[in-house]
Amino acid sequence: MLPINRQQHILKWLKEEGSLRISDISARFGVSEMTVYRDVNQLVQSNQVIKTAGGITLPVRTPQTDHMCSYCLKPVNQAHSVQLITVNQDIEQLCCAHCAFLRYADKTEEVSHLICRDFLLQTTVSAGSAYFVVNAELNLHCCQPQAIPFATLDHAERFQKGFGGAVCTFDQALEDMLQDRKKRCTCTKK
């Protein structure tokens, strides 16, 4: 079984049981505890689980965390925020499209919708149908490299003429963010 499949099973079990011991996970999968620790560490790094003494649990959501990015833990600025809606109808707030792309990549199978705001008009738009200007010279003072969403290709191209960058579809921007994740990502994600 691949690590991503084990991680999905771990998250499913956590939702059903609340907490799990590393030794129990190891026994269920028939793998070493070291293998489980590697899987769990990836979930901890993406803020999907919290380590406890000898085990793991799901993070507790508080009203304060609703105003913090679920990826990098920065405060969410409503003008640039993105909402990730899961198939279970859970809503995660993200500070910008950059973090939304990275969070989406971490949990693609669980995502139902990504909702963002058009940069110029501040209207709500599905990220899947939006156009993004990636690496524009205008600094939004959020995570880098930045991806700025637009509802129309025309607006994205006009913005690009003034501020540079590359106009991308959702899939192209996602690929760019994932390639730059290790090189230029400025997220303070722990």
UniProtKB/Swiss-Prot annotation:
Induction: Significantly induced under copper-limiting conditions. One of its GO terms (molecular function) is DNA-binding transcription factor activity. It is found in: Cytoplasm. It comes from Bacillus subtilis (strain 168). This is HTH-type transcriptional repressor CutR. Residues 20-39 bind DNA. Disruption phenotype: Cells lacking this gene show little or no difference in growth under copper deprivation, whereas possessing enhanced growth under copper excess conditions. Possesses a high intracellular content of copper. Keywords: Copper, Cytoplasm, DNA-binding, Metal-binding, Repressor, Transcription, Transcription regulation. May act as a negative transcriptional regulator of cutJ/ycnJ in the presence of copper. May use copper as a corepressor. Residues 3-58 form the HTH deoR-type domain. It comes from the Bacteria. The keyword Metal-binding applies. GO terms for cellular component: cytoplasm. Its main location: cytoplasm. PANTHER family: HTH-TYPE TRANSCRIPTIONAL REPRESSOR YCNK. Pfam families: HTH_DeoR, NosL. InterPro entries: DeoR_HTH, N2O_reductase_NosL, WH-like_DNA-bd_sf, WH_DNA-bd_sf.
